[in-house]
Amino acid sequence: MTELWRLSATDVAHLVKTRKVSAREVAEAALQRLDAVNPHINAIVDCRPDVVRDHADQIDSVLARGDEVGPLAGVPVTIKINTDQVGFATTEGSRLQENLIAKSNSPVVDNLLRSGAVLLGRSNSPTFALRWFTSNLLYGGTHTKNPRDPQLTPGGSTGGGAAAVTAGIGHIALGTDIGGSVRYPAYACGVHGLRPSLGRVPFYNASLPEATIGGQVMHVVGPIARTVADLRISLSAMSVSDPRDPWSVPAPLDGPPMQLRAALCLRPAGKHVVPEVEASVLDAGRRLADAGWVVEEVDDTPPLNESAEVNEWLWLADGFEQLASAAEREGDPGALAVVAFAKPRTKTYLADAVASALVQRATVVRQWQLFLNKYAVMVIPVSAELPFPDQLDLQGDAAFQRVWDSQFLLRATPALGLPILAVSTGLVGQTPVGVQIIAGRFREDLCLRAGEAIEARGTPPAPIDPYTSP
């Protein structure tokens, strides 16, 4: 049999539910894989084998009684360090929160446990989830490495989760996204990541203060995985509505039939992208056309400059001073670089900036919804560049500005509240590349259908051994 850690989550769940393998066997394989490769990439910062084995044994006990288990039966899943999990610190990569032990699970963690998942460990993140690179001072000052190439960023802020999935440490990673933190790590590591619609997956951290307005409107939780099918089953597991999240909506996972029509935009909002990224979008379009989709290249998207402005308003005008103060007390170079870049921009925002942003958001979202009533999906680049050299944002003001500008399409989209899938289209040499697929609100099914068509006509990501210098 193929080594268990190499299998898809879908295949693992089937084997466990049919009792061809035990959840304990899967857990032991995952722990062995973690021990073998995690020292090379620092993806998982807190793993407690006894807890992992206990989760697995509970699944096996349920099956032994003849009872039903959920869609993720026995599947090892990693949890990001900014998400409440009972008995673990919700550190957000900060020494200030090293002892902030969660007394209850976030709703999405409860959903994963009810689905039969085995929680393998806590994945690394930059301090306060502020960067598209993954390092912090809390965990020994080391940073997470991209398994494909340690010279490239693994992405952020769910860099640990994406690196783990890529290296076969677990089958699914739970991530969060307010500015690309699920989508960019998936892109950088050459796997897939889904940013669900606002309200699709419930989230709440009882260990932390109430979220700011920007966080409530733009922050979502989603999965990273090696196959689109695994994103599909993990989304179904995560999406059970929960009253602790006021934005949570019990929406159906599948919407009404719609013509399979995709809009392709190579340079949204007129932004320059490198030729390799443009070629990836065209390649995705060809694969969709081959799968029977009607594909049309369009000159531009509905408003993105205005949506990016909303994102920035909501981030800088609400709670930024508290965040800046925490970053200064923490002293993390990456967090301080973000604060130094952003602080001068806060002076442009008036007292009513949040209200103005929410008014503008309504106009922008309306135009996107009307567009996506005509097209099932929109396909655009993830980033203007291939994955960055690691820690590029710490190389001075010009380098930070380059990163900020290149990530426009990740920053501009969260305020829309729409589902967005980052799907890998393959490699340029040994460097990952991919596209974003956007659909109407609660139409993750259309994102996933398009993603499956693209994946099926390429080479689906498979777990790899981390790259090490010869």
Regions found by a protein language model. Name each.
Residues 19, 30, 74, 114, ...:
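Glycine-rich, small-residue loops and helix-cap segments
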Residues 72-92, 151, 256-265, 314-369, ...:
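Short helix-loop capping/hinge segments that flank enzyme active sites or metal/cofactor-binding pockets
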Residues 20-28, 57-60, 275-299, 323-331, ...:
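Acyltransferase
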Residues 52-60, 116-117, 126:
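Long amphipathic alpha-helix in the N-terminal Rossmann-like dinucleotide-binding domain
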Residues 195-283, 302, 458-470:
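A short helix-breaking turn/cap at a secondary-structure junction
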Residues 72-221, 265-267, 317, 382-399:
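Short glycine/serine-rich loop/turn segments
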Residues 1-54, 290-292, 463-470:
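An N-terminal boundary/leader segment
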Residues 30, 52, 231, 262, ...:
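Residue-level signal for inorganic ion chemistry
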